[in-house]
Amino acid sequence: MALRTIDSLGDLRGRRVIVRCDLNVPLKGGVIGDDGRIRASLGTLTGLREAGARVIVISHLGRPDGTPDEKYSLRPVAARLGELLRADVAFADDTVGDSARAAVEALGDGDVVVLENLRFHAEETSKDETVRRGFAESIAELGDAFVSDGFGVVHRKQASVFELAQALPSAAGSLIASELEVLDRLTENPERPYTVVLGGSKVSDKLGVIGHLLPRVDSLLIGGGMLFTFLKAQGHEVGASLLEEDQVETVKGYLAEAEERGVKIVLPTDVVVADGFSADAAHEVTRADAIEGTPAGAKGLGLDIGPETADAFATIIRGSTTVFWNGPMGVFELEPFAAGTKTVADALTRVEGLSVVGGGDSAAAVRALGFDDDRFGHISTGGGASLEFLEGKRLPGLEVLGWQ
């Protein structure tokens, strides 16, 4: 069965449409650090407004542990959404209480209200299906139809993602549809050469993706903290760098499988090693197989890929027709260790084909380093969701919308 789209809901004029967005943006002191996820929601919200729907936006933000916490309030998000829509956006101080009901009652055709953080209610993320269903039904009382457009949460069986879609006539928004279209191109007959770039801190987070994509890719480039588990699997010492000792044997298996399949797993030839985890730590570039030969010795921390590796990765990326990247190459938040990530990001902007930035830390990195979104083929809004899709896992938030 195909994914249900908004068209399946019929005429929406005057109807109350609850839209589950993923507006989980970085927020500090009420200031939004990156509004990319808010911008990503605009297509669906604008379409619903133009159709005359009365739009009720719901989302989570952060992890407030099931109780109200002002620092996780969606109020600043509602204000920014209003600026981007160039329209008045109302805000309700609760999710299913008197404020929410009054705000929804006051909506006219084409109006928008944002309800308070879903995760101020422990029921949203409860492991008990009955509890989640009860909360979903409370939300459903506010609307006539439901649109799921938070791609970043479709891998989670939560009340506003799974049960709410069963409580009302439901469909996927345009953001989810576009995400699936792009991810399909990465798994179903991708144009070649096809390169996957993986970074980030833990190799254990990426094992499923590696296993699922090995039969499909031409090259797999490994950076970030996870590279040190690969180096260890090759017999190299890695100092005090991040290492998942319990994954070494699994990595050895993938290295052997890649060789059998003729897939190139490209590991760094040089790394930036520091004597501490700070921007002012003494650091130097060294060969990847000689980390403990630096002045820091066994206490040396590998915090970025080296310039030789970055250039080699960039050459492979630029020569590819399809590229998927998930995970920074180093600790990009600290300027001395951002060069590898910046070089890889720049190479993706030069791909003459499909370049996909896989959400999460990768999306944050390219924006923090000054790259505009439109320089890439696609920046996913779903870090974990994108990875689980590429692992071939079943995603409950999609299946409930008819996706198979």
Curated annotation (Swiss-Prot):
Location in or out of the cell: Cytoplasm
SUPFAM superfamilies tied to this protein: Phosphoglycerate kinase
Residues that hold substrate according to the record: D22, L23, N24, R37, H60, L61, G62, R63, R119, R156
Chain sites annotated for binding ATP: K206, G302, E333, G359, G360, D361, S362
Keyword presence, rRNA-binding: no
Any one of the GO CC terms: cytosol
InterPro entries: Phosphoglycerate_kinase (IPR001576), Phosphoglycerate_kinase_CS (IPR015911), Phosphoglycerate_kinase_N (IPR015824), Phosphoglycerate_kinase_sf (IPR036043)
Reactions this protein catalyses: (2R)-3-phosphoglycerate + ATP = (2R)-3-phospho-glyceroyl phosphate + ADP
Pfam families found in the cross-reference section: PGK
Pathway given in the UniProt record: Carbohydrate degradation; glycolysis; pyruvate from D-glyceraldehyde 3-phosphate: step 2/5
Assigned EC number: 2.7.2.3
MF terms in GO: ADP binding; ATP binding; phosphoglycerate kinase activity
Gene Ontology BP annotations: gluconeogenesis; glycolytic process
Keywords: ATP-binding, Cytoplasm, Glycolysis, Kinase, Nucleotide-binding, Transferase
Main location: cytoplasm
Similarity comment text for this entry: Belongs to the phosphoglycerate kinase family.
UniProt subunit comment: Monomer.
Protein name (Swiss-Prot/TrEMBL): Phosphoglycerate kinase
UniProt source species: Clavibacter sepedonicus
